[in-house]
Amino acid sequence: MKNTAAIAAGSLVAGIGYASLIERNAFALRELTMPVLTPGSTPLRVLHLSDLHMLPRQRRKQEWLRELVSLQPDLVVNTGDNLSHQKAVPAVVQALGDLLSVPGVFVFGSNDYFAPKPKNPTNYLFNKKRRIHGDPLPWQDLRAAFTERGWLDMTHVRREFEVAGLQIAAAGVDDPHLKRDRYDTIAGPASAKANLTLGVTHSPEPWVLDRFAADGYQLVLAGHTHGGQLCLPFYGAVATNCDLDRSRAKGASQWGADMKLHVSAGLGTSPYAPVRFCCRPEATLLTLVAAPAKGPVIGSRAGQAHPTASVR
């Protein structure tokens, strides 16, 4: 019995060490092709970033982010939770670097507005509705830094713009996790003239996704879930920290008859839970291509999208 207990304790310590020291710093780039553009459209390269949860001292993460500009994306989409510290805005801006010169859109999440706090981990499973906010974060400074470089704030607005010769009609909401979403401010049919109709939200709450789908959006990008952060082999994400089902905790899926969803597993963690297991931190390069003339089968997964991962 003593030997068994010692082995179990040793395995637990090793697992925690791996999750906290190795995997959470093993940044990966996923590449995914999604057929969502109107027929006849040329491909569009979209870099999806989310949940940086940046601390000023996280040099490895900052250096990895700076290299992503070499991917030459046409558009950057940032789905929030950039900050984990009052003084992290300069670190985020410096890490994004030349990506801020690429056309971009963004919305904020709870950890752009409020600093993280220690939380009971069982709340993620049994008390998801409870919200514990930390001190206010300098989100106004972050928004100013993004918009001054040309990124578009999508919080409760609809915008139409051109990227790489394609017309994009985008709309976004404030963080549904904080109940800040006001979809009625952007409600209405998506533009029929656009090559891409894009919805942007931090937390992929089903009630928001349903509204985007009902308005005819082709693609919604979201973050928040961290891909589950702690996943189990052959089971997947233990929790999503929202009302989205576990099977959609990260990656591409079909939502309704005509809309695709992509949820980023994100690049960071709360400083009070600095672990990842079977869920590497990631950025995703989405190659959006023209959809076939006939729509996908209702209820199908995004089976045409085959992700590949590489470390950069």
Please provide the spans of the model-predicted regions.
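Active-site environment of divalent metal-dependent phosphoester hydrolases
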Residues: 54-59, 83-87, 111-117, 154-164, ...
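Core catalytic region of metal-dependent phosphoesterases/phosphodiesterases
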Residues: 60-162
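Acidic, His/Gly-rich catalytic cores of divalent-metal-dependent hydrolytic chemistry
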Residues: 9-29, 255-312
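Binuclear metal-dependent hydrolase catalytic cores centered on His/Asp/Glu-rich metal-binding motifs
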Residues: 118-151, 155-157, 163-210, 273-276
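Beta-strand-turn-beta hairpins that frame and shape the catalytic cleft
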Residues: 35-47, 151-152, 158-170, 192-194, ...
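Active-site neighborhood of phospho(di)ester-bond hydrolases with catalytic His/Asp-centered motifs
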Residues: 48-50, 75-81, 103-110, 154-156, ...
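Conserved beta-sheet core of the metallophosphoesterase superfamily
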Residues: 204-285, 292-293
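N-terminal active-site segment of His-dependent metallophosphoesterases
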Residues: 12-95
